[in-house]
């Protein structure tokens, strides 16, 4: 099932050209407090001991985007920015109901609309009633000013959405836009299966699973884990 939530507890500097760091984008948006530790973290650290690092007690929610219009047509989608289908919207609502009582402080999504919209729709079901807002991460000063929330009170009811290409779906290269069944007929089922499921073999002009995993892991270790360590509850809305 798409847009389902997987709950887990505890536990790169951004390389996007023209993008500021997540910390800087938080400050620019008027959300400085997200760069601090969560309210319960200090007490947890004081109680920690031994060789193991203390747990932050933070939640991590992993969510796959709802069905896209190309999923519905059995097309290779990859990094093409295809919207959700009607079914995908309903799946996002259903996923939101499943995590309605799980605390969420910050959301990470890919740069693709289907992952962002899934997260935004899901959060409309959340018990907190907080508003998910996409952060502007560019360097244009006018755009930074225009996108800033100037009310500190309102800012504390915002759940920031951080977009990054490092969480994008695997790039399928020259397969993108083609029907999966038709590609199997023209290139052979074994070859297409290898392109899709081999860890090291990439489709023509695309990414292997190994390449995809490297960029995702680097982003998680350098950006997501520090948020969890600060005690912030994180949701990632991305791809399978």
Regions found by a protein language model. Name each.
Residues 191-211:
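Short glycine/proline- and acidic residue-enriched helix-loop micro-motifs
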Residues 1-10, 16-19, 24:
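N-terminal mitochondrial targeting presequence
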Residues 57-65:
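Short, hydrophobic/glycine-enriched beta-strand segments
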């Amino acid at each position: 099932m798409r847009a389902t939530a997987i709950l887990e507890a505890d536990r790169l500097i951004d390389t996007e050209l023209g993008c500021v760091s997540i910390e800087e984008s938080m400050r620019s948006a008027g959300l400085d407090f997200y760069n601090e530790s969560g309210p319960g973290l200090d007490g947890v650290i004081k109680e920690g001991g031994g060789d193991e690092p203390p747990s932050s007690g933070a939640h991590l929610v992993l969510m796959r985007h709802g069905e896209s219009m190309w999923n519905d047509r059995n097309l290779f989608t990859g990094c093409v920015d295809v919207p959700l289908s009607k079914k995908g919207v309903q799946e996002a609502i259903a996923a939101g109901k499943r995590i309605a009582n799980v605390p969420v402080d910050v959301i990470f999504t890919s740069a693709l609309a289907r992952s962002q919209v899934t997260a935004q729709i899901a959060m409309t079901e959340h018990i907190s009633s907080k508003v998910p807002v996409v952060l502007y991460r560019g360097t244009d000063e006018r755009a930074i000013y225009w996108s800033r929330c100037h009310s500190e009170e309102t800012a504390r009811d915002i759940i920031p959405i951080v977009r990054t290409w490092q969480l994008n779906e695997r790039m399928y290269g020259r397969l993108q836009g083609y029907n999966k069944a038709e590609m199997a007929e023209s290139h052979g089922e074994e070859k297409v299966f290898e392109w899709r499921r081999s860890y090291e073999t990439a489709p023509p002009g695309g990414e292997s699973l190994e390449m995809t995993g490297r960029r995702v892991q680097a982003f998680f270790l350098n950006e997501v884990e520090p948020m969890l360590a600060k005690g912030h509850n994180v949701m990632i809305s991305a791809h399978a």
